[in-house]
Amino acid sequence: DLVWDYIRGVFHTVMLKDIIERNSIRNIAFLNSLLNYFADTIGKQYSLNNISKFMKSQGQDIATKSIASYLNFYKESYLVSTVNRYDIHGKKLLELNEKLYFGDVGLRNLIVGGGREGDIEKVMENIVYQQLLRMGYSVTVGQLRAGEIDFVCTKSNERVYVQVAYLI
């Protein structure tokens, strides 16, 4: 429980000082709802329009511009990061439907209420993404015509393709 207390303290400090106070956030309920949404959907493609539709279905009618601003606040505080998709055949970055990962899986697990049994693959993918960044790679998500490669990693002239799987 000491570990969870520490993680909870870090989370509250980041939320209060790095996000709420720094950006003069007034809609704290939405800030929390959006972070819960991101925590629940790590490693999945997202679009601001789809998030807006989901939030509206939950009784929170928020403009996509506001969602983009709040997402940027999270990114600036290093709570989350987004990863562009890379068209492997066309060899170009795609601007839509990025993926989102947490900077710290412990913080993510705190938000969703602990490690959940069905989350192992999402959490593993998040951990691998963070490790690839620590190793100095520039990381994108590989887009194929009929699927995706979890990560396309580039460092200098080296390119590595990584697929994360819990069970094969």
Place the predicted regions along the sequence by residue.
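Accessory nucleic acid-recognition modules appended to NTPase machines
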Residues: 2-159, 166
